[in-house]
Amino acid sequence: MGKNVVVLGTQWGDEGKGKIVDLLTERAKYVVRYQGGHNAGHTLVINGEKTVLHLIPSGILRENVISIIANGVVLAPDALMKEMNALESRGIPVRERLLISEACPLILPYHVALDNAREKARGAKAIGTTGRGIGPAYEDKVARRGLRVGDLFDKEAFAVKLKEIIEYHNFQLVNYYKEPAVDYQKTLDEIMAVADILTDMVVDVSDLLYKATQKGELVMFEGAQGTLLDIDHGTYPYVTSSNTTAGGVATGSGLGPCYVDYVLGIIKAYSTRVGAGPFPTELFDETGGYLREKGQEFGATTGRSRRTGWLDIIAIRRAVQINSLSGFCMTKLDVLDGLKEVKICTGYRMPDGSVIETTPLAADDWEGIEPVYETMPGWNESTFGVKEHRKLPQAALNYIKRVEELTGVPVDIISTGPDRSETIILRDPFDA
């Protein structure tokens, strides 16, 4: 049997998953997106050329890799076509390398309209969504009224279903949010224009992955966002609308959980977050600005600047537990270069003075929490582009070792730059 590897974020997303997936797909036959939508932003740099993917799996740039958008992903046809066209204009044969589950829910214009109307209505209490219709599309899925890719095989029936659901959502848009209605005919025409392109890529993903595993082919599952944004286990309600954790692999792809052999958690050497929500180690001083500028912490999807802070081991430990992590890949270590000292959060001081070492579950319970830090010496030497473990500064090695000690999880991969070549692999997940 083949070895199946999951790559996911351990923080609030933006950990650098895309590069690592691209790197490891050199050995994989399939790369599978199993949750989220085009709210993800995965940046790849190959031989100096930058590619940003939102919906298509990061394996698409590899000749011998099949990329799969599985049933757990909410699919926006317009976003997919835009991404496909951009890649095809560069000579990448996307339609030969991409497969789609017919069970993928569709994101349509009324989902986007609802998403933005709700954020506008929340005002100061806005969650900070990407405004791309992700949440409303998942709502329709759970309410069993959503349209899926498979519905496009019967265009007449699709048109009837679309009319019913647009009337349903327009009632809310117009009467409650006082926003314009979504035009039915325009929406229908747009989706019909690409219907055949989508259905031509449809495959039974669950069956395909099961047979691939039985044949010994290697499968990689590419997570989007991060553990702390999981709908169930994240800082609710400041979360995304899907299961970003390892448990989402089985439900989001149709391959049983026993077929997962290794879970790689991507851990940025410091913390970042986009949008509202708890962030105990957030920095508002010069150091926070330094991390943001040096780390180029601006969203690949929205362009929004990210909040920055020190590494939070308490939150990382939660990710270890939930995902049963096999190993870490530490990214952006080079951003810490030049700092006199680096800090790691090892506890939370509660308003009553007590110190806890677990994360609260509800967002309100995070109020008043102060981080308890362990301070370590920084390093002046550059780690950027270093490709050998022994050539890293001793202080940087000590930092990595301390993370391993505090979490009980080995750092198997270290990323020292954006290019796929700027990586130190201590243990390959496919060989672990």
UniProtKB/Swiss-Prot annotation:
Binds 1 Mg(2+) ion per subunit. The active site is at residues 14, 42. GO terms for molecular function: adenylosuccinate synthase activity; GTP binding; magnesium ion binding. This is Adenylosuccinate synthetase 2. It is found in: Cytoplasm. HAMAP family: Adenylosucc_synth. The keyword rRNA-binding does not apply. GO terms for biological process: 'de novo' AMP biosynthetic process; IMP metabolic process. Substrate binds at residues 300-306. The keyword Nucleotide-binding applies. Plays an important role in the de novo pathway of purine nucleotide biosynthesis. Catalyzes the first committed step in the biosynthesis of AMP from IMP. Mg(2+) binds at residues 14, 41. GTP binds at residues 13-19, 41-43, 306, 332-334, 415-417. Belongs to the adenylosuccinate synthetase family. Its main location: cytoplasm. IMP binds at residues 14-17, 39-42, 130, 144, 225, 240, 304. InterPro entries: Adenylosuccin_syn_GTP-bd, Adenylosuccin_syn_Lys_AS, Adenylosuccinate_synth_dom1, Adenylosuccinate_synth_dom2, Adenylosuccinate_synth_dom3, Adenylosuccinate_synthetase, P-loop_NTPase. One of its GO terms (cellular component) is cytoplasm. Pathway: Purine metabolism; AMP biosynthesis via de novo pathway; AMP from IMP: step 1/2. SUPFAM superfamilies: P-loop containing nucleoside triphosphate hydrolases (SSF52540). Its cofactor is Mg(2+). Keywords: Cytoplasm, GTP-binding, Ligase, Magnesium, Metal-binding, Nucleotide-binding, Purine biosynthesis. It is an enzyme of class 6 (ligase). Its EC number is 6.3.4.4.
